[in-house]
Amino acid sequence: MIDKKILRFYYITDENAGSFTPFEQVKTAIKGGASIIQYRNKFFSSEHMEELVLIREFCKNRDVPFLINDNIDLAAKIMADGVHLGQDDDSPETARKILGKDAVIGATVSNLEELACTDLSCCDYMGTGPVFPTSTKKNAKPVKGPAGFKQVADKAPVPVVAIGGITAENALLCFEHGASGIAVISFISRAENPADNAHRLGLACELALTQAVKGKYE
């Protein structure tokens, strides 16, 4: 079972952030306190491999788990720490067989209907959203709000990471509604000051962890 603290500040790379490359994004996010990284690139090709290896090594040297989005074979090839799978990807069971018992495996579950028909027995966590409006994912499911997120999180058999429109200002609201972690993309990748946003988000996550230890929630 994954330590939920690892999920607290979850950064997902953005391949469409112009000159702010995924590698620079990851460095900025980790400096701000990111505790886990997911590499997401829907148009991945061999020309991206060099940067992917740089990101893997940067994360490894800082003891930050590094996951690949969707692609189990790529995760195995570059010896990533795990993979995150969507509803239309290969199953978590397949990922576990290929990547091994120590791999971190996550799955996207957007609503109660998907939760009812998704086998999470091989997963360490699941991601749910969008909690708030987001422009990063064009085909995102309907916004569920904190209350809708809580409905899914309360029934989940694994820790849940909130995603979608999350900022330093609303991160605590996600934790208070059952999130073990919050995942962000554009709050850092499309920010006017990415380093400042990463720092502020890190502080919000640290505050959430402190309050959880005190027993306020979680």
Indicate residue ranges for each PLM-predicted region:
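A short glycine-leucine-enriched loop at secondary-structure breakpoints
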Residues: 164-165, 178
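Short acidic/polar capping segments at secondary-structure boundaries
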Residues: 132-133, 166-168
